[in-house]
């Protein structure tokens, strides 16, 4: 236990918080170019083919980004917007691609949670 005088000379250091999304360099999103678009399988006990892409960001990092929603139009050299947010059952995937922005199309025929998938409001019949 330090004395008051010791604390006056050298105050307590607050622990430094490590960023969960270092490639974004303290920005909300970053633009990048897809270098590879592929599917991968999740950890146990889940089973699926999750759509992901390797993205070279403007910050210089190359990261793996998850493509949410049903169906996508991404291929190599597509320009995408990447936000933070990990995918719990995919190790190493700490970013999400933003749907409906830059070269990424929104999810077709999406009725609920549209803003998360870049889907426009459907026309009234």
Curated annotation (Swiss-Prot):
Residues 113-125 have a biased composition (Basic residues). Residues 101-125 are annotated as: Disordered. The modification 3-methylthioaspartic acid is found at residue 89. InterPro entries: NA-bd_OB-fold, Ribosomal_uS12, Ribosomal_uS12_bac. The keyword rRNA-binding applies. One of its GO terms (molecular function) is tRNA binding. Pfam families: Ribosom_S12_S23. One of its GO terms (biological process) is translation. Keywords: Methylation, Ribonucleoprotein, Ribosomal protein, RNA-binding, rRNA-binding, tRNA-binding. One of its GO terms (cellular component) is small ribosomal subunit. The keyword Kinase does not apply. Part of the 30S ribosomal subunit. Contacts proteins S8 and S17. May interact with IF1 in the 30S initiation complex. With S4 and S5 plays an important role in translational accuracy. Belongs to the universal ribosomal protein uS12 family. This is Small ribosomal subunit protein uS12. It comes from Thiobacillus denitrificans (strain ATCC 25259 / T1). The gene is rpsL.
């Amino acid at each position: 236990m330090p004395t008051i005088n010791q604390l006056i000379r050298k105050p307590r250091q607050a622990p430094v918080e490590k960023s969960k999304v270092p490639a974004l360099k303290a920005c909300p999103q970053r633009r990048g170019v897809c270098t590879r678009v592929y599917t991968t399988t999740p950890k146990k006990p889940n089973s699926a083919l999750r759509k992901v892409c390797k993205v070279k960001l403007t910050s210089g990092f190359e990261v793996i980004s998850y493509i949410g929603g049903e169906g996508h139009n991404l291929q190599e050299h597509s320009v995408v917007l990447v936000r933070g947010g990990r995918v719990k059952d995919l190790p190493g995937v700490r970013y999400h691609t933003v749907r409906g922005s830059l070269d990424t199309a929104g999810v077709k025929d999406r009725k609920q949670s549209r803003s998360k998938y870049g889907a426009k409001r459907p026309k009234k019949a």
